Regions:
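Gly/Pro-rich cap/lid or specificity-loop segments adjacent to the active site
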Residues: 1-166, 222, 228-270
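Alpha/beta-hydrolase-fold enzymes
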Residues: 130-224
Length: 270
């Protein structure tokens, strides 16, 4: 996997260390994120790494090289999330190399950015499902309102653990990707509404490990930021006043504004 496995790993230790210890997604901290990534990428370039060679197009070409190497006439593609973008690009570049393509959790062009409006819509979709479940309603008549109330009344610390809203919302955002994790995070909010913030305090701290163990962040800054639009104010999308949750994961794109190198975009047709 180009940029992750093999001889070159696009590791970004300065970014990880800074991100793990951020308390708020303020403009000052977001700018520091961009500076940290810039420093990490500069070190990679000083080691002889050509960062322009680590785009999704190169990834797709690697797959085609492997197909040829194995002598397959056609191959089947099974892709989820980010992988669906690779599958999509592969289908455009090498349509005759594909036998079948199965995709789930589709990530179309532009899909690396989670807008606050879409996240709000998805949270309310969870809320609608909740209201149709008598067992769930017995715990809370409105899980969305529960989340909103809890986020508005968070203590600064709980039993010695700092409870930081921006970090908590970020890890909540990550956990809402899957229904099993969503159920767990809802349980934590339900407990907090009853005065037990231990689960949310743990999640606020656990984001450290989530960031540290997430696949190589430099890979994101050479592939994922292809959806970055310099005309968009990503900082304003993190905590928009009209929505209670916002888009905490947008902090990554907000930091891209402060990179000291141009973003390598892929051809427009992809």
């Amino acid at each position: 996997y180009r940029g992750v496995d093999g001889s070159v790993s696009l590791a970004t230790p300065e970014f990880v260390e800074l991100f793990r210890n951020m308390d708020t997604f303020s403009r000052e901290n977001i700018e520091k994120l961009g500076e940290a990534v810039s420093a990490d990428l500069k070190k990679l370039e000083e080691q002889g790494v050509d960062l322009d060679g680590y785009t999704m197009v190169e990834m797709v070409d690697d797959v085609e090289t492997v197909r040829k190497g194995f002598g397959y006439t056609t191959i089947n593609l099974y892709a989820g999330s980010y992988g669906t973008r690779l599958s999509y690009i592969y289908s455009l570049r090498y349509p005759k190399s594909i036998h079948r393509s199965f995709m789930f959790a589709i990530n179309p062009p532009g899909g690396f950015v989670w807008t606050p409006e879409m996240i709000d819509k998805q949270i309310h979709y969870y809320g609608d499902l909740w209201k149709n479940d008598p067992e769930a309603v017995a715990k809370s008549p409105d899980i969305v309102k529960t989340m909103q109330n809890v986020l508005e009344s968070l203590p600064q610390e709980w039993n010695g653990l700092n409870v930081i809203p921006d970090r908590l919302k970020l890890v909540t955002n990550f956990m809402l990707f899957h229904t099993d994790d969503a159920a767990r995070v809802f349980d934590a909010y339900l407990a907090a509404e009853q005065g037990d913030y231990s689960g949310l305090a743990f999640l606020s701290v656990a984001v450290y490990d989530i960031v540290a163990t997430t696949p190589t962040w430099g890979d994101h800054f050479t592939k994922g930021v292809v959806d970055y639009d310099p005309e968009v104010n990503y900082e304003a999308k993190i905590n928009p006043p009209e929505l209670f949750f916002g888009s905490p994961s947008t902090v990554i794109f907000a930091g891209a504004k402060y990179l000291d190198r141009p973003i390598t975009y892929i051809p427009e047709e992809y």
